[in-house]
From Swiss-Prot:
GO MF annotation list: flavin adenine dinucleotide binding
Localization in the cell: Cytoplasm
Name the UniProt record assigns to this protein: tRNA uridine 5-carboxymethylaminomethyl modification enzyme MnmG
PANTHER family per record: GLUCOSE INHIBITED DIVISION PROTEIN A, PROTEIN MTO1 HOMOLOG, MITOCHONDRIAL
Length: 679
C-alpha cells in the first residue's frame, strides 16, 4: 500500500533540470506552494552535454527568461568562465551573448538560489507513478486508492511509496523516460551517464494513454587538458568588455556579479585572461583530418547510428560526427572546439564531436588530430535514447490536451537544448500557477518573444526530430532582439509578480529615456558650417554636406550615439539606452515595416477558437484539414493558418463558422495585447 499521509502542494514539478528549475521558481514566486522533485539533488540543473549557455536565438531566449524574472541568465553570469557576443559584425537582430559556464558551479549556484526561494521545497525522489484526478485510459493496477486523494488533485508516487499531491503537475523529465545510453555495442539503462532512467514513469505515462515517441541525442567524449598540445590549436578569447545576460545589475543597485569561482585556474590552459574586467579562460579550435575521417568510415559497421541499434530520431542540426562525415562526404575537415568544463578542472568538452562509436574508435579518431596525438579520454561519448510526447499533445500554455492541470516542459516536448527547456519551464510554471489561482493562461505571441515562436512551433508543427531554436525561425526577429528583451517582457513579469515594482520602474524609465532622446535627435536641425564640421570631424564623423537632422546623422552606419553626443552637445545617457537609440534610429524604416506586418497578423491571432470547437462538424472542410485541426486544436485563427496542410479556403470556412457561432452566443471580449490572454 502507498503512504496514507500524503503531502499536499499547489504545484509539483517532477525533474530539476533547466526546465524544472525555472518552472518551480516561477510557480513559487507567483505565490504557489511548490515542490521540486529530482532523482539527485546534487545534479540539479546539471549540464549533461556542453558547458555553454546562449548563442544565436538561444542567447535571445536566455535574455527573455531574465526579462521575465527567470534564473538562467543570472546564474550563468555568476559562473561563466568565458563570454562573447556572437555575430558582432552582423545586424542587431542576430547578435547574441554566449557563455562557457563552469558546469559544476552552475548546478551549485542554482541549487543555492532555489533553496532561498519562499514557497519552494526541494526533495530527492524518483517518481514512478502518476495518479490523475480522473484516471483516463489506464491499463494499470486497480489498487490506486483514489478515494484517499483530495478531489481535483494529482498525485505522484515515489520509489519509497511516498505520495505527494497537487492541483497542478509539471513534468520536466528530460532524457530520463525509459532512457538508454549507447556506446558501440554497449547499451545500458540511463537518463544520462551514471544516472538511472525513469523507466517506471515512462511505462506509467504510456499506460495512461499518452502517445510517446523515441528520440535520440548524443554527447562527445571529454578529454584531459594535460594531454593536449595547445601550441597546435587556435585560441579563442572571450569579450574584452563587460557583458552579461542579466539586465539592470547597476540600476537595481546590485553589484555586477562576481564569479563564483576563485583562485588560479587549472594549470593546463594557456593564455588565461586573469587581469581583465573578469577572469576568463579561452577555448581552443582544432580540425578533423583525412585520417580522422578514414577511421570513422572504416568503423561505420560498428556505429550504432547505422547498425540499427539506435532507433530514436536525432537532432538534424546537431548531428554526430559520424553522421556529418557520411552526410558531408565532400568536406575535408570539420572544426572542433575544445571547451574547458570549469575553472579548476582539466576536463575538456570536444564541441562538434558528439558520437556513439565504440570507445576504441573514439580514442583512435581523436588521436589522429595533431594537437591530440597523446590525448587521454576521461569520459567516452555516448548516445541517449528516451521517450517524448508525440506531436499534438500540448496546448499553447504548455498544458496537456488530455488532462487539465497537467503541464509539460523541456525535452519531453521534443526539444533539445538547455535554453529551449528553460524557456518552456518558465512558461509551464507560470501557467501552472495561473491554473491553481483560477486565472487565464499567459501566452506569448510570435511577435512578442522567441519564447512565443518556440511554443507556437511546438503546438502547430509536426516535430519529427529534436527541435532547436534558430533566429531564422522568428519572422519578426528585428523586433525580438536580445538587447530589448527587457522592454518587451519585463512589464508583463511585473503584472505576474515575477519581478518587483522597482525593476519594472527601471524598464519604464529606460523606455522613456530612449523616446526622449529620439525626439531630441529628430528636433535638432544641423546646417553645414565650419564649426559643426570641425566638431564632427574631431569625433571621427564625416562632415555635413547639406541640412539634416541629428537623427539622420546617427543613421549613418558608422556613427554611434555616444560618439555623436559630445560633438552635438546631446544629453548623456547610459550605454544600454544609447544602444537602443542607435538601433531605433538606424533601423526605423525596417522596424516600422515589421510593426505594420505584426498588426496585420495580430488581428488573426486575436480571433480565438473556443477550446471545445467541433471541427468534425464543420461542413465543406477537407478531410485532411479536419483531421489536422482536430489533432492540433489551434487556439487562434493565426495558429490554424500555420498548420501544415491548412490552406486559405479552410481558414475562410473556419472564419464563417466562428462568425455564425459568435452571432448565436454572447461575444467574448478579446484581451488587450499587453495583458495575459487565455489559452
Amino acid at each position: 500500500m502507498h503512504s496514507t499521509h500524503p503531502y499536499i502542494y499547489d504545484v509539483i514539478v517532477v525533474g530539476a533540470g533547466h526546465a524544472g528549475c525555472e518552472a518551480a521558481h516561477a510557480a513559487a514566486r507567483m505565490g504557489c506552494r511548490t515542490l521540486l522533485l529530482t532523482i539527485d539533488l546534487d545534479k540539479l540543473a546539471h549540464m549533461s552535454c556542453n558547458p555553454s549557455i546562449g548563442g544565436p536565438a538561444k542567447g535571445h531566449l536566455v535574455r527573455e527568461i531574465d526579462a521575465l524574472g527567470g534564473l538562467m541568465g543570472r546564474v550563468t553570469d555568476r559562473t561563466f568562465i568565458q563570454i562573447r557576443l556572437l555575430n558582432e559584425s552582423k545586424g542587431p537582430a542576430v547578435q547574441a551573448p554566449r557563455a562557457q559556464a563552469d558546469k559544476r558551479l552552475y548546478a551549485k549556484v542554482m541549487k543555492e538560489t532555489l533553496e532561498t526561494i519562499p514557497n519552494l521545497d526541494l526533495r530527492q525522489a524518483m517518481i514512478e507513478r502518476i495518479i490523475l484526478p480522473r484516471p483516463i485510459n489506464r491499463n494499470g493496477s486497480d489498487t490506486d486508492d483514489a478515494e484517499a486523494l483530495c478531489p481535483g488533485h494529482y498525485a505522484v508516487v515515489t520509489h519509497t511509496r511516498r505520495i505527494y499531491q497537487c492541483r497542478a503537475l509539471v513534468l520536466t523529465t528530460g532524457t530520463f523516460l525509459r532512457g538508454r545510453a549507447i556506446t558501440g555495442d554497449a547499451i545500458w539503462g540511463a537518463g544520462r551517464a551514471g544516472e538511472a532512467p525513469a523507466t517506471a514513469l515512462g511505462e506509467d505515462l504510456a499506460a495512461l494513454g499518452f502517445p510517446l515517441v523515441r528520440l535520440k541525442t548524443g554527447t562527445p567524449p571529454r578529454i584531459d587538458a594535460r594531454t593536449i598540445d595547445f601550441s597546435l590549436t587556435s585560441v579563442q578569447h572571450g569579450s574584452a568588455t563587460p557583458l552579461f545576460f542579466g539586465f539592470y545589475y547597476r540600476a537595481l543597485n546590485e553589484a555586477p556579479p562576481e564569479p563564483a569561482f576563485g583562485g588560479p585556474p587549472a594549470s593546463a590552459y594557456p593564455e588565461p585572461l586573469l587581469d581583465a574586467w573578469r577572469p576568463q579562460l579561452p577555448c581552443y579550435l582544432v580540425h578533423t583530418t583525412p585520417e580522422f575521417h578514414e577511421i570513422v568510415r572504416r568503423n561505420l559497421d560498428r556505429a550504432p547510428l547505422f547498425s540499427g541499434i539506435i532507433e530514436g530520431v536525432g537532432p538534424r542540426y546537431c548531428p554526430s560526427i559520424e553522421d556529418k562525415i557520411v552526410r558531408f562526404a565532400d568536406k575535408e575537415r570539420h572544426g572542433l572546439f575544445l571547451e574547458p568544463e570549469g575553472w579548476s578542472t582539466h576536463e575538456v568538452y570536444v564541441q562538434g564531436c558528439n558520437t556513439s562509436l565504440p570507445e576504441d574508435v573514439q580514442w583512435a579518431m581523436l588521436r589522429s588530430i595533431p594537437a591530440l596525438r597523446r590525448v587521454e579520454l576521461m569520459r567516452a561519448g555516448y548516445a541517449i535514447e528516451y521517450d517524448a510526447l508525440a506531436t499534438g499533445e500540448i496546448a499553447a500554455d504548455m498544458s496537456s490536451r488530455r488532462a487539465p492541470g497537467l503541464f509539460f516542459a523541456g525535452q519531453i516536448n521534443g526539444t533539445t537544448g538547455y535554453e529551449e527547456a528553460a524557456a518552456q519551464g518558465l512558461m509551464a510554471g507560470i501557467n501552472a500557477a495561473r491554473f491553481v489561482q483560477g486565472k487565464p493562461s499567459v501566452l506569448l505571441r510570435r511577435d512578442e518573444a522567441y519564447i512565443g515562436v518556440l511554443i507556437d512551433d511546438l503546438v502547430t508543427k509536426e516535430i519529427r526530430e529534436p527541435y532547436r531554436m534558430f533566429t531564422s525561425r522568428a519572422e519578426h526577429r528585428l523586433l525580438l532582439r536580445a538587447d530589448n528583451a527587457d522592454l518587451r517582457l519585463t512589464p508583463l513579469a511585473g503584472e505576474l509578480g515575477l519581478v518587483d515594482r522597482e525593476r519594472v520602474a527601471v524598464v519604464e524609465r529606460k523606455r522613456e529615456e530612449v523616446e526622449r532622446l529620439l525626439a531630441v535627435l529628430r528636433g535638432k536641425r544641423l546646417y553645414p558650417s565650419a564649426a559643426i564640421n570641425a566638431r564632427l570631424s574631431a569625433a571621427g564623423i564625416a562632415p555635413l554636406t547639406g541640412e539634416m537632422s541629428a537623427e539622420e546623422v546617427l543613421r549613418r552606419p558608422e556613427v554611434r550615439y555616444r560618439q555623436l553626443q559630445p560633438a552635438l552637445d546631446l544629453p548623456a545617457c547610459e550605454a544600454d539606452v544609447a544602444e537602443q537609440v542607435d538601433i531605433e534610429a538606424k533601423y526605423s524604416g525596417y522596424l516600422l515595416k515589421q510593426q505594420r506586418e505584426v498588426e496585420r497578423l495580430r488581428r488573426m491571432e486575436s480571433r480565438r477558437i473556443p477550446p471545445d470547437f467541433d471541427f468534425a462538424a464543420l461542413r465543406g472542410l477537407r478531410n485532411e484539414a479536419r483531421q489536422t485541426l482536430q489533432r492540433f486544436r489551434p487556439a487562434t485563427i493565426g495558429q490554424a493558418a500555420r498548420l501544415a496542410g491548412i490552406n486559405p479556403a479552410d481558414i475562410a470556412l473556419l472564419l464563417v463558422a466562428l462568425e455564425r457561432q459568435t452571432r448565436q452566443a454572447t461575444p467574448v471580449e478579446t484581451p488587450h495585447p499587453s495583458l495575459p490572454h487565455t489559452g
